[in-house]
Amino acid sequence: MLIPRKVKHRKQHHPRQRGIASGGTTVSFGDYGIQALEHAYITNRQIESARIAINRHIKRGGKVWINIFPDRPLTKKPAETRMGSGKGSPEWWVANVKPGRVLFELSYPDEKTARDALTRAIHKLPIKARIVTREENF
């Protein structure tokens, strides 16, 4: 699973999710991609689940690029714990995703199979997303 090797600070603030993605909005490496249509925190488990769904569908024929990385820790306090006494311990690593961001890219010769694989991956993600192609960039 994707987690940072080393971080300067173990716990971070959680800013409001607002605005649209300024970079990473076009398909750069592959022929098809998954583009986010809303804000979300996507966990490392969700990213891994979507990657496995794509790879199982395309078998050995194509190549997958993951364009997001879970670099932000989310904390949680234990159940039945009283308020106060500091911030909870880090539980998950998440990627902050804004609308317009291309999350995954796929290079595959057959368009129908590629779209089916990306549709399966979209079902694993907690956001609304769409499939974009390299031709739509220009």
Curated annotation (Swiss-Prot):
Span list, region Disordered: 1-23
Entry superkingdom: Bacteria
Database matches in Gene3D superfamilies: Ribosomal protein L10e/L16
Gene Ontology molecular-function annotations: rRNA binding; structural constituent of ribosome; tRNA binding
An example Gene Ontology CC term for this record: cytosolic large ribosomal subunit
A GO BP entry: translation
InterPro entries: Ribosomal_uL16, Ribosomal_uL16_bact-type, Ribosomal_uL16_CS, Ribosomal_uL16_dom, Ribosomal_uL16_sf
Pfam family of the protein (one): Ribosomal_L16
Role, per record: Binds 23S rRNA and is also seen to make contacts with the A and possibly P site tRNAs.
HAMAP family cross-referenced by the UniProt entry: Ribosomal_uL16 (MF_01342)
Quaternary structure (record): Part of the 50S ribosomal subunit.
Protein name: Large ribosomal subunit protein uL16
Gene: rplP
